[in-house]
Amino acid sequence: MSVTNLKESSRKQYSEAEWQIRIDLAAAYRLVALYGWDDLIFTHISARLPGPDNHFLINPYGMMFDEITASSLVKVDMNGEIVGESDYKVNPAGFTIHSAVHEVRHDSACVIH
């Protein structure tokens, strides 16, 4: 399978809106790494996904910020369950902080700590 086909197959499993948020969030992770604002694997950025399901994207546990891609981000629900398929897990501490904010602040599209 060519790289182009691999990218296309990854992309097709997400809606246009989710894919754009994934791209933007992965870029935010890379930018934070570029400026040295990350703390190894202990800093997190999450982005709320549109829709009634209350899902958000967060970084995979153990992955450095400069390694994160749109397709490696993990979609989770408010119970910490991974939504869809993922080869990765999430950091429980990061999930706890971000889910608490996303649960009560529906106007917050992104959380960084």
Please name every model-derived segment.
Residues 1-2, 47:
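Polar low-complexity intrinsically disordered regions
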Residues 22-112:
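An anion-binding catalytic pocket shared by soluble metabolic enzymes
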Residues 2-16:
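Generic N-terminal amphipathic, Lys/Arg-enriched alpha-helix
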